[in-house]
């Protein structure tokens, strides 16, 4: 025990000594604290603080033990039990005190020594630290002071520089101002001299003016004297003229008295003739008279207005106007007319045509609707001619009323205006017999009517039967000789027989004009003939012809003389006439709808209209007494005009009173072709007989129509186009063919004005005066040009008519043609060489007239039509080559030809100072103004007499056009520079794109120009990155500066204006407009920042990948160094990697590093050794002994999918992940030497894989790289194609985005949908290797107007790329689970029949479902292109009863054919039948699958009711010709895809059907044979959707698995399985049970994607 205690004791005492020794050594070791830095002092302080804390802990521990040690030391020696103390005691007693050291030293002394030493050290450290801190503070204060002094020094230096600059500017300004002031002083001195010189000149002029003024005063005094003398002479002449007027009035009074005497003689003669015996006419008809009452409206104007036509209704007001028809008895107080004459009252021409203003806008030739009234004190008789208009006549007339005839009935509105033209209004007495179908008919007319209508007692057009009593001759004794009367009878009979023979069997049209007048618009006007003096007495009618032999009798008979009675002109307008002992008042002429004066006895009693008879007329010609037989057709109606000229009716005034139905040739404005060219629409027979289309209104009058003298007849025949009558008259001798009426209208003028080309040709052949002008100076050429009768114009020009003749108002034929928009006439006149610069009295030129109408074609002809080189021989080829396209297509003619009109003509001002541009701008004719502006000599700043420019009077549209008049349209293009190299998938990426055209005006400033460029770029970026088709106008309201792809105005690197560089905000001394013109800048090019600048903006614009994503990719490469991009083939992986490498290279070079890009293409033969050599040669792998270089290396490995990643990169994974010398890797070179290498930290490795997903051993590599997946259904690939194609369309349309309904947009959207639907279907099929990136679709052609080009391109893409990939993918999947003997390669080379069938089915489904669906081409065009697609129509053959081990007898079943062509029609469905093959026990035990019979209807008809459709079947017998489970899975997926609601319904593509064909398999087991006759399917409401084309059901039993495919008529495709539920197995149900019709359908299947190994065999669950 003592030994243990002794061995322990020295240990306790040695520890304090060691501690004290260590402390002493530390104290002895001196070091200089002053040499330590601040950080070292802080570290020392922290160490010492830690040491002090440790020592404090030791002290505390020692204090705890002190008490125990003290007691032990003091009292331990007395403890006899302790052997240790005993030894100590012996030791102390054995030697001297000085030589002995206590065995156990007192710890307190040791502790106190330690504490004292620590305190000393602490005090010393504190002092040194305080000194160091004070020195540090002092140093920092000095540094702050120094910085403050430096800043102050800089400020003072900057202020000094500013002051110097300011002083320099002030000095320069002072120098400049001195120069300017000195120059101004010199200018002022010069001006002062000029002003003094002008002052002297003005003084001289003032003196001269004063002298001239005094001379003018003298001359004015002399002229006043002369005027006084002339006034006295005028007074003398006035007195003389008054005396002469008095004499004339006396003479007129004498003549009136003589007229009264003549009237009395006429009455006596009539009494004598009435007393003579006549034919069997009832006696009382002698006493019936109809008076013609004239009601004047101004002055002494009188009009004798009568009508002998049927009733006319006014459909506009639905008010029936009856003219005054009054039977009167002979009376001495009032003059009477011949028996059964008819009278009608019309106060004025305005009352005859109230409120009709159809042609007022036609200018000179087609004037206002107010007719010209005759001068006062002129007696006028309205000639009895039809006056037709396009609206019904407001004035109506009634048929004559014999005493024994039924009262007339008003005509219903539904009959008269059948052809938008009322029956004619006749305005003259008919001094002849009454109308046919009434008693008192002229026998000659009745004879003609007999041939025309058959029996007089036959029902008329409305079924009314009127009796015709024997007519009598109502003519008095004739003064003509019998020979003349005999000749007249013969000629009239022949003419009537010619006229009536073609019309014998045809019923006449009730109350309607002939078809020839349909569509014509004759203006309204007056129909009058002026009388001079006494009315002439007619020579009477020809003698009658017996009724039994109509038209053949030659027996003469004395005719009746016919007298015209003019009512005295002094009668007032409100005079009443006493008729039949009843006074009928004439209402005032101011009534708006005309006067309605009706005899109470003659009111209509029936509602059925009274229709006129068949036409038959007499033509009486004057003085020679020879009656000419012809039929004169009438198109009568005056032509009102606001200005004089071409507004008077032809032959409206005549010196003769002509008792005839054909009053004159009216001024007609024909519009329809038939009225312009009557011969074109009439039959040859009608034309030969003289019948003109406008004859019917005349012939409907119902009474005879005798004519007057030959000159008047000539004019009438020419005006009415009666070639027969005209030729007969021209063959007579002594006829003046140039005779003109009072208005100056000749026969040639009338024919030309009415467009009767044949009559014009006859008159010109007869040498009529071609340039004879009327009283207003209008020639026949003027009339024809104004009316648009271009054939007449051409004929007149051929006969050398004066084409530059100017009327009294200065109107030339060219001016009139332009005024009335007659393009053909303008063209003919210009080709004839007419003068385009002739001006009217108002200062108007033809250009003014053309612009005033707003007719662009007329203006283009005037400005650009050139005179042919060969004069009038202007053939069609020259016209086609020299005359431009009036429609103004893309090839603008004015861009090819220069205007032929001079600038003076364009800028000519009329009387008000208005140019043609003023007129076009004020009326808003923008097209005309644009044509004028294209003339280089136009002066838009010319002012009118009110000091207004064209811009001042223009409408808003025209103001905008004028503001852009001289604007430069310069295309703005975006350039991305060179895209290199082309093998990176950048073939289809365009380098330049036109985004818009900038309008640069004269007033455009550089600030406006900068804003326009920035806004155009922003709008373009937003438009191409939007979801829909936006135009640039649609995005201007969007204020966002950044587009979806991240580009903005800040992405610009530089801008060039032509070849001059420019930056946004920069200004030149010239304005943008002047700058562009001077430098001839044809385009503005914007260059985007690219990889050369370390940016990716140009890459974003070229590839349409958003900038944010590209920047993120670059960040990943810089951060991880190892990045692989993978996605479907064609996802632009190579392009992205190369552009990222370029950008990274330039960034590193900008930072001062050298950088190199190394590219390697990997193929199947690329080995690991080759990759090692690549890494070593590029200094990416560095030997451990070698020091690294500062060079940066970028390695690109392309097409990594062609080799095994795990084999190729396995040895490099670890050193790539840990790049340092601490983790080297040993590699063996090709020469057998091995060495340690490590990867350089400055090496970047990027790779590309054209594969949608990794599989198998390649997944081992995945964790060692950073992967970027480019999915087709996610950004950036999802929207890349849409953005790219939209940009291509915008570029094709020169920056203008078309509307969404444009065919180009539709075909582009179709191409986009094809890519999306194709990938969607391929993903559902579980063939990701067949997915396509957007690269293949970037080359989609955009050809406006040629959508078939895109379809042809799609067919080539389908046949060359898509179909082979799909075929390979389907075969690859179908052969994965083959038996060992059938490998994948063998399956691809020699596919089985089942695999071929599946491939063909897949191709057909994809084609119809993804490609052809949605094609915007019409069905007919699409049918033509369908055959170009591979797999569009195929027979799918399925072998029945196939066994997996070997073939049984059931394998000889027939092949089923399913034609998926959507183009064939088929009939009804045949009832599908089910057949079970004869299956051996072994076949049932093995894995079995039913035979797949595609009983298909290839119909894509429209949606029908599902309950009424017969279902289609999918027969799956015990073994399919498919060789594996995956083939069956593919079939099921194809079926499911056909019925998927998420996919497009191919039923929308076509509308055809195929006959359902059924092939029975060789089944011998009758028990397993089942026939389902009425297979129906209960479908929920959700199933009836346009996208769900198939629904299926599945059933299984204990024996075999049978698939029942129940489909709608909509689809011909295989039936899906994913949407059905399996029926529970029912052993009680036999296979022949018909209960399989009870089917449930699962609509909730959300399954859309299939994996490769997902579906197992159908019967595995039964095992």
Swiss-Prot record:
Record key words, sorted: ANK repeat, Cell projection, Coiled coil, Cytoplasm, Methylation, Phosphoprotein, Repeat, Synapse
ANK repeats: 709-739, 743-772, 776-805, 809-838, 842-871, 912-942
Chain positions with Asymmetric dimethylarginine modification: 498
Modified residues (Phosphoserine): 1524
One GO CC annotation: FAR/SIN/STRIPAK complex
Record-linked InterPro entries: Ankyrin_rpt, Ankyrin_rpt-contain_sf, Cortactin-Actin_Reg, Cortactin-binding_p2_N
Biased composition (Polar residues): 411-422, 583-597, 1582-1599
PANTHER family according to UniProt: CTTNBP2 N-TERMINAL-LIKE PROTEIN, FILAMIN/GPBP-INTERACTING PROTEIN
Assembly, per entry: Interacts with CTTN/cortactin SH3 domain. Interacts with STRN, STRN4/zinedin and MOB4/phocein; this interactions mediate the association with the STRIPAK core complex and may regulate dendritic spine distribution of the STRIPAK complex in hippocampal neurons. Activation of glutamate receptors weakens the interaction with STRN and STRN4.
Function (record text): Regulates the dendritic spine distribution of CTTN/cortactin in hippocampal neurons, and thus controls dendritic spinogenesis and dendritic spine maintenance. Associates with the striatin-interacting phosphatase and kinase (STRIPAK) core complex to regulate dendritic spine distribution of the STRIPAK complex in hippocampal neurons.
Domain of life: Eukaryota
Subcellular location: Cytoplasm, Cell cortex; Cell projection, Dendritic spine
A Pfam family it matches: CortBP2
Main location: cytoplasm
Extent of Low complexity compositional bias: 386-396, 1624-1638
Basic and acidic residues: compositionally biased ranges: 1645-1663
Region (Disordered): 1-23, 203-222, 358-440, 454-479, 498-616, 1447-1477, 1581-1602, 1618-1663
Organism of derivation: Papio anubis
Coiled-coil region list: 119-276
Protein name: Cortactin-binding protein 2
């Amino acid at each position: 025990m003592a030994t243990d205690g002794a061995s322990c004791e020295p240990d306790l005492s040695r520890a304090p000594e060691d501690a004290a020794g260590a402390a002493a050594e530390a104290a002895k070791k001196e070091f200089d604290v002053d040499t330590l830095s601040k950080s070292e002092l802080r570290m020392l302080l922290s160490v010492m603080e830690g040491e002090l804390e440790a020592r404090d802990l030791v002290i505390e521990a020692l204090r705890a033990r002190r008490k125990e040690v003290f007691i032990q030391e003091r009292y331990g020696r007395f403890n006899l039990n302790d052997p240790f103390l005993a030894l100590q005691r012996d030791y102390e007693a054995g030697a001297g005190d000085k030589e002995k050291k206590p065995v156990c030293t007192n710890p307190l002394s040791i502790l106190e020594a330690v504490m004292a030493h620590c305190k000393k050290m602490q005090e010393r450290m504190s002092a040194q630290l305080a000194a160091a801190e004070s020195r540090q503070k002092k140093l920092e204060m000095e540094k702050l002071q120094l910085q403050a002094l430096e800043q102050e020094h800089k400020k003072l230096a900057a202020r000094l520089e500013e002051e110097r600059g300011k002083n320099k500017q002030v000095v320069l300004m002072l120098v400049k101002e001195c120069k300017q002031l000195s120059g101004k002083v010199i200018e002022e001195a010069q001006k002062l001299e000029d002003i003094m010189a002008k002052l002297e000149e003005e003084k001289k002029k003032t003196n001269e003016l004063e002298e001239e003024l005094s001379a003018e005063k003298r001359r004015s005094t002399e002229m006043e004297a002369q005027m006084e003398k002339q006034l006295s002479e005028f007074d003398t002449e006035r007195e003389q003229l008054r005396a002469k007027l008095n004499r004339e009035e006396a003479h007129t009074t004498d003549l009136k008295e003589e007229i009264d005497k003549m009237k009395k003689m006429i009455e006596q003669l009539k009494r004598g003739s009435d007393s003579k015996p006549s034919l069997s006419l009832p006696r009382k008809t002698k006493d019936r008279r109809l008076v013609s009452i004239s009601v004047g409206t101004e002055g002494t104007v009188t009009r004798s207005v009568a009508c002998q036509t049927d009733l006319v209704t006014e459909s506009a007001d639905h008010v029936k106007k009856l003219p005054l028809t009054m039977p009167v008895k002979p009376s001495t107080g009032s003059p009477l007319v011949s028996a059964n004459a008819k009278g009608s009252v019309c106060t004025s021409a305005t009352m005859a045509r109230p409120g009709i203003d159809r042609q007022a806008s036609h200018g000179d030739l087609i004037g206002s609707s107010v007719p010209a009234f005759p001068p006062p004190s002129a007696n006028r008789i309205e000639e009895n001619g039809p006056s037709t208009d396009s609206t019904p006549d407001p004035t109506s007339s009634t048929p004559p009323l014999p005493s024994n005839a039924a009262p007339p009935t008003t005509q219903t509105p539904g009959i008269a205006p059948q052809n938008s033209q009322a029956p004619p209004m006749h305005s003259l007495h008919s001094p002849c017999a009454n109308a046919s179908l009434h008693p008192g008919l002229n026998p000659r007319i009745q004879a003609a009517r007999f041939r025309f209508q058959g029996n007089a007692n036959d029902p008329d057009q409305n079924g009314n039967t009127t009796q015709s009593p024997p007519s009598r001759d109502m003519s008095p004794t004739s003064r003509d000789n019998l020979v003349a009367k005999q000749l007249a009878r013969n000629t009239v009979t022949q003419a009537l027989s010619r006229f009536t023979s073609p019309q014998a069997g045809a019923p006449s049209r009730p109350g309607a004009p002939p078809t020839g007048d349909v569509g014509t618009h004759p203006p309204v006007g007056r129909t009058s003939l002026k009388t001079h003096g006494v009315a002439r007495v007619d020579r009477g009618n020809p003698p009658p012809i017996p009724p039994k032999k109509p038209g053949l009798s030659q027996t003469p008979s004395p005719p009746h003389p016919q007298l015209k009675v003019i009512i005295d002109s002094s009668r007032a307008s409100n005079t009443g006439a006493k008729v039949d002992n009843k006074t009928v008042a004439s209402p005032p002429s101011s009534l708006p709808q005309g006067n309605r004066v009706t005899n109470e006895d003659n009111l209509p009693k029936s509602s059925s209209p009274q229709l006129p008879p068949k036409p038959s007329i007499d033509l009486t010609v004057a003085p020679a007494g020879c009656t000419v037989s012809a039929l004169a057709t009438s198109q009568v109606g005056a032509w009102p005009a606001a200005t004089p000229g071409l507004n008077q009716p032809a032959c409206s005034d005549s010196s003769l009173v002509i008792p005839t139905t054909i009053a004159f040739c009216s001024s007609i404005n024909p519009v329809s072709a038939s009225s312009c060219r009557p011969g074109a629409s009439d039959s040859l027979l009608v034309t030969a007989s003289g019948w003109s289309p406008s004859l019917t209104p005349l012939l409907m009058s119902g009474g005879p129509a005798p004519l007057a003298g030959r000159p008047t007849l000539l004019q009438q025949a020419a005006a009415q186009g009666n070639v027969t009558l005209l030729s007969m008259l021209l063959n007579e001798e002594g006829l003046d063919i140039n005779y003109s009426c009072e208005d100056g209208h000749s026969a040639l003028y009338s024919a030309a004005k009415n467009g009767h080309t044949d009559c014009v040709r006859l008159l010109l052949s007869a040498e009529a005066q071609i340039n004879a002008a009327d009283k207003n100076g209008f020639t026949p050429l003027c009339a024809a040009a104004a009316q648009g009768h271009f054939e007449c114009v051409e004929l007149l020009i051929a006969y050398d008519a004066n084409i530059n003749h100017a009327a009294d108002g200065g109107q030339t034929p060219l001016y009139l043609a332009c005024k009335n928009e007659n393009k053909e006439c303008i063209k003919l006149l210009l080709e004839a060489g007419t003068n385009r610069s002739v001006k009217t009295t108002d200062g108007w030129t033809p250009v003014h007239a053309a612009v005033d109408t707003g007719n662009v074609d007329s203006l283009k002809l005037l400005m650009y039509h050139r005179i042919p080189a060969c004069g009038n021989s202007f053939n069609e080829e020259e016209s086609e080559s020299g005359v431009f396209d009036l429609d103004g297509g893309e090839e603008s003619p004015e861009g090819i030809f220069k205007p032929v009109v001079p600038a003076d003509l364009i800028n000519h001002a009329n009387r008000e100072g208005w140019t043609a541009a003023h007129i076009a701008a004020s009326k808003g004719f923008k097209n005309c103004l644009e044509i004028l502006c294209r003339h280089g000599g136009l002066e838009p700043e010319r002012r009118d007499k009110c000091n207004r420019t064209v811009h001042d009077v223009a409408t808003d549209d025209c103001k905008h056009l004028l503001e852009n008049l001289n604007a430069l349209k310069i295309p703005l293009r975006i350039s991305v520079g060179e895209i290199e190299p082309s093998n990176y998938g950048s073939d289809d990426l365009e380098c330049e794109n036109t985004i818009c055209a900038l309008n640069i005006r004269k007033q455009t400033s550089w600030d406006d120009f900068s804003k326009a460029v920035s806004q155009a770029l922003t709008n373009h970026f937003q438009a191409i990155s939007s979801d829909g088709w936006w135009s640039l106008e649609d995005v201007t309201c969007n204020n966002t500066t950044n587009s979806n792809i991240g580009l903005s105005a800040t992405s610009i690197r530089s801008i060039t204006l032509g070849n001059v560089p420019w930056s946004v905000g920069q200004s030149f001394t010239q304005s943008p407009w002047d700058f562009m013109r001077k430098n001839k800048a044809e385009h503005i090019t914007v260059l985007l920042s690219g990889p050369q600048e370390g940016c990716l903006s140009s890459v974003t614009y070229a590839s349409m990948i958003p900038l944010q994503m590209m920047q993120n990719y670059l960040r990943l490469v810089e951060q991880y160094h190892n990045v692989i991009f993978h996605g479907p083939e064609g996802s632009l992986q190579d392009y992205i990697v190369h552009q990222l490498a370029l950008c990274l290279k330039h960034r590193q070079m900008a930072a001062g590093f050298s950088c190199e890009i190394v590219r390697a293409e990997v193929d199947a033969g690329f080995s690991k050794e080759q990759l090692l050599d690549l890494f070593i040669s590029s200094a990416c792998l560095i030997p451990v002994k070698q020091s690294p270089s500062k060079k940066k290396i970028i390695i690109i490995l392309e097409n990594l999918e062609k080799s095994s990643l795990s084999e190729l990169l396995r040895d490099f994974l670890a050193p790539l992940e840990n790049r340092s010398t601490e983790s080297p890797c040993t590699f063996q070179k090709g020469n057998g030497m091995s060495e340690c290498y490590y990867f350089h930290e400055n090496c970047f490795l990027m790779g590309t894989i054209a594969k949608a997903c990794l599989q198998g051993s390649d997944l081992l590599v995945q964790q060692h790289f950073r992967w970027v997946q480019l999915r087709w259904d996610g950004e950036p690939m999802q929207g890349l194609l849409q953005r790219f194609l939209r940009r291509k369309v915008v570029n094709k349309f020169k920056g203008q985005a078309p509307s969404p309904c444009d065919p180009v947009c539709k075909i582009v959207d179709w191409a986009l949908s094809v890519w999306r639907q194709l990938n969607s279907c391929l993903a559902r099929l579980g063939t990701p290797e067949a997915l396509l990136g957007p690269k293949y679709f970037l080359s989609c052609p955009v050809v406006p107007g040629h959508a078939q080009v895109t379809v042809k391109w799609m067919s080539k893409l389908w046949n060359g790329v898509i179909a082979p990939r799909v075929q390979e993918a389907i075969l690859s999947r179908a052969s994965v689970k083959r038996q060992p003997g059938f490998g994948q390669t063998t399956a691809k080379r020699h596919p089985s029949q089942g695999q071929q069938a599946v491939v063909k089915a897949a191709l057909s489904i994809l084609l119809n479902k993804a490609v052809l669906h949605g094609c915007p081409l019409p069905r007919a065009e699409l049918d033509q292109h369908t055959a170009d697609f591979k797999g569009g129509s195929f027979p799918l053959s399925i072998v029945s009863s196939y066994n997996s081990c070997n073939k049984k007898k059931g394998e000889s079943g027939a092949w089923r054919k399913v034609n998926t062509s959507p183009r064939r029609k088929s009939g009804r469905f045949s009832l599908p039948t089910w057949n079970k093959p004869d299956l051996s026990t072994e076949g049932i035990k093995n894995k079995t699958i039913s035979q797949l019979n595609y009983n298909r209807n290839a119909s894509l008809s429209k949606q029908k009711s599902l309950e009424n459709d017969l279902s289609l079947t999918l027969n799956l017998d015990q073994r399919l010709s498919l060789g594996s489970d995956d083939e069956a899975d593919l079939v099921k997926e194809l079926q499911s895809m056909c019925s998927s609601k998420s996919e497009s319904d191919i039923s929308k593509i076509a509308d055809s059907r195929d006959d359902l064909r059924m092939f029975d398999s060789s089944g011998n087991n009758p028990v397993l044979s089942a026939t389902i006759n009425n297979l129906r399917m209960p479908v929920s409401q959700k199933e009836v959707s346009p996208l769900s084309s198939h629904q299926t059901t599945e059933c299984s039993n204990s024996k075999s698995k049978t698939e029942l495919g129940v489909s709608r008529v909509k689809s011909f495709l295989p039936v899906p399985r994913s949407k059905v539920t399996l029926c529970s197995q029912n052993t009680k149900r036999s296979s022949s049970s018909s209960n399989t019709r009870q089917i449930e359908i699962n609509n909730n299947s959300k399954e859309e994607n299939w994996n490769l190994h997902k579906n197992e065999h159908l019967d595995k669950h039964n095992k």
